[in-house]
Amino acid sequence: MLAVAFPHNQVQILPYNRTVKDLGGLGPVDFLEAIRERFEMEAGPAVPRARGDIAMYFQGAWHTVRPRIGTDRSDPIGSLDVSVLQEQLLAPVLKIADIRTDKRIDFVGGARGIAELERLVDSGKAAVAFSLYPVSVSDLMDVSDTGAIMPPKSTWFEPKLRDGLLIHVI
């Protein structure tokens, strides 16, 4: 086990983005229609501007999607963008019920950047990519204060620690 403690002002949390290999049996038009039923959608930047915005890369273009149904900000887990994406898009639209076991979803750590998401979609290795606003240290602490754990693949911490055997010569 590797454990470390950092002051909250010395750790950076980057987004843990997602790519999905296929559209769950939907064609492109039906996929976009299903998105528009649940989200406001407009052309937008590759990096979300604020919490609540999810950037989606599909067919060579970036879109900003925002849920039509508001999130309960008093729910520290349910209000996270990763939870909103899972509950309102990945599960109902793309039929990805469990991101831990579904082979159609991959995760791209924030350090790899937006260009990696575009490369994966443009090369055909993924059908769609989602760029998320990073979880804040405050969000992380709020979840911890409830005794809960963060959703899988919701945080990418920097600096990364090298793990392995450490030897100190005396």
Task: For every predicted segment, state its role.
Residues 1-170:
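Surface-exposed, charge/polar-rich loops and edge strands
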